[in-house]
UniProtKB/Swiss-Prot annotation:
Protein known as: Alanine--tRNA ligase
PROSITE patterns, per the entry: AA_TRNA_LIGASE_II_ALA (PS50860)
Entry keyword Metal-binding: yes
Family annotation (SUPFAM superfamilies): Class II aaRS and biotin synthetases, Putative anticodon-binding domain of alanyl-tRNA synthetase (AlaRS), ThrRS/AlaRS common domain, Translation proteins
Enzyme class: ligase
Binding note for cofactor: Binds 1 zinc ion per subunit.
Gene: alaS
GO molecular function, one term: aminoacyl-tRNA deacylase activity
Lineage of the species this protein comes from: Bacteria, Pseudomonadati, Thermodesulfobacteriota, Desulfovibrionia, Desulfovibrionales
NCBIfam families: alaS
Amino acid sequence: MITANEIRRRFLEFYKAHGHEAVRSSSLVPKDDPSLLFTNAGMVQFKKIFLGQEKRAYSRATTSQKCLRVGGKHNDLENVGRTARHHTFFEMLGNFSFGDYFKEDAIKFAWKFLTEELKLPKERLYATVFRDDDEAEQLWLKHSDIPAERIYRMGEKDNFWSMGDTGPCGPCSEILIDQGEHMTCGPDCGIGKCDCDRFLEIWNLVFMQYDQDATGKREPLPKPSIDTGMGLERITAVCQGVFSNFDTDIFQAIIQYTCGLANVSYRSDDETDTALRVIADHSRAIAFMITDGILPSNEGRGYVLRRLIRRAYRFGRLIGLTDTFLHKTALKVVDIMGDDYPELRENSDFMARVVREEEDRFNRTLDKGLSMLEDELATLSASGAAHVPGDIAFRLYDTFGFPLDIVNDIAEKRGFSVDEDGFKALMKEQKERAKAAWKGSGEKDIASRFQPLLEEGMRSEFIGYDHLCGEGRIVALMDEHALAVERLAAGQKGYLVTNRTPFYGASGGQSGDIGTIASPSGKVRVVDTIKPSPELVVHHVEAVEGDILLDQEVDLTVTEDDRVASARNHTCTHLLHAALRRVLGDHVKQAGSLVAPDRLRFDFTHIAPMTPEELAAVEREVNRVIMADIPLETDHMHYDDAVKRGAMALFGEKYGDEVRVVAIADESVELCGGTHLRATGQAGLFLIVSESGVAAGVRRIEALTGWNAMHAVLAQRSEQAQLSAMLKARPGEIVSRVESLQKENRTLRKDMERAAAQATSGQGRNIMDEATDVAGVKLLAAKVEVPNVKALRDLMDDVRSKLVSGIACLAAVDGDKVQLIIAVSKDLQTRFTAPQLIKDVAAEVGGSGGGRPDMAQAGGTNPAGIDAAFAKLRSLIGG
């Protein structure tokens, strides 16, 4: 039986033999496409090439791209595990032509690979073409053994592809395989008639031959291109003769491993099988997402990861996995796929720790959710309700990750039904809000703004590694809206491109240079420098003298102090990265950075806050290398050679075949295109000013170097002198003096709390006299004076200890706010619950609240409504 690994290998080798460059899979996080949450197709990393915004050294490529689809038109998460072919993570095999070959070779290659390499039976293969694509049909007849009756013409919905409303587009041709009559769904089964799995699409060939404008008009592209995609999981199922992707070797190793953990069998019952498939699928997604730098959080990509971890964990509970297990199944993914994706092995320890921590966190959350559901069911039972409202089910899902089926299961056992329609309506609202709120990854899509320049093939030669000034010619001039102009006059802002420039364009976390550009007729101040593509540098300018004209010869001068300050911070960023790995461990990976003239910021993967001792050790390490005054070496080499040398490739960065390596002896070797110092001693001083968390598993260090670090040290010295004077203590005595003051403060605070407790206890005895009888229920409703909410709760505890049977309501005013607490004795909870009562009572003071059946708390903003609130409570009890 051919394995998935063998299919992947054969595919890449086949296309390499036909002149294609085998390109590494890009990250699941699309670096240059802010419109996408995740990489969801093989063409994503080549999008700029198709759009004419980027050139590469090759014109044909092949990849096995890791992809993620978790919603929208591509995938409904709730279907994963329940169908044969829905997945979150998958691999897309693809071949691409960038103005090289077109339809004929694309069809020839595909047919040859399927029938000669994979040896699929020719008589079971079908093809579809776009309804107007006579050329594609003739090519299928010419280069394959598919007869005309097995070639179907389809409409635009099925067989026409576009990148968006405008841009490259074209017809496509799908290859399908007949899986046999036993898969027939009915008398109307057939291609274009149904969606069953008898005629299974295995490969899509996209022929990009048009450019569509905003009106929908399509013009032929000067260089048509090819984009194909074939899911590895699907073609593996076909080759292995199974009808579910989950029955392939890709998933079975994980499924059988999970069976061993849970002591269950696959193919025993639908519920168990679904759980095992979900765990296998999500384990793959989780392992790759964390490896690509995504960490659990409550928004964006991190929220998707958190949902997948929690969904898989819940399904584990359904098959008896009560302890944490998902970190183990994720490590199984590393065992299976680590040879083909080495980054999995490099990050396996950290990945497993992140999953384990998230499992532990969810375990605690689940217990809280179950408690909340029990409270809600008790309240509903007391009120005689038979249905769980949709908003309660949704709140449990949204807050605690409870799926509807778990709520249904628990509710059904207690005799309740669940308002599923209400739940689904709220889910729909949330999805629409999330869709509206998604503004992209936060990156500015600079390339699209300068699309015309890129399409013209405009390039800039960067000379700034060796020079801070130089001569060049203005080859493009634009106004502040990036529209082409002939001149910029004094006071006008705009953009300027020269054929040569010493200005560094913002990229790799480093800020763009500032400076001046002067011509014989005028001068502009460069306020920023941006880099829309690897070959193009654009100066954001403001004209300050005379006129600047298109096609003028100019002198370009970078502001030296800012460039050197940025170089200090960039070199120290490399030293910081290396020091963190030495002090904390090799799991540390860069998760983001900012290199500006005034500071550096470095985000990195690490579970826990750093201790003062660890921070001091990192600071010492960086300064040790600075004081050693080690020369920096830069070199250009092939990516594979750089990696063999030990150079670190940073998360989220895209690298070509030729890379620049920055080495600081044996201390640090990284792939980097930024500007650096000549030797580490030029950094002067490195000072960490803060360490904080920015997301689960991601820490941030902010630091200063050079003169900025020196100024900070002098400021700290001045502040220390002020503290010494205020505390009347010498510098070495400041800490002990503050400790003494804190001890004194704690003593005074305890004295105050003791006095407040004595006053509260006496108040509890006094207000018991205010209790009245309402419809046979003893009711105490009193307005009290307490210093804080804790004292109010303590007072209620005192009242409850004295109130054997009855209901108590205490109200306390704090400025323009009100706090209410209601308690219900156990014998009355079949008639009244505290959350049920406080909902209407709190409304009278402009508030709301909730709690347990025996006690609930609320806050309000209308102290004048307290009497009305007490009256409302009496009416509720009196019926």
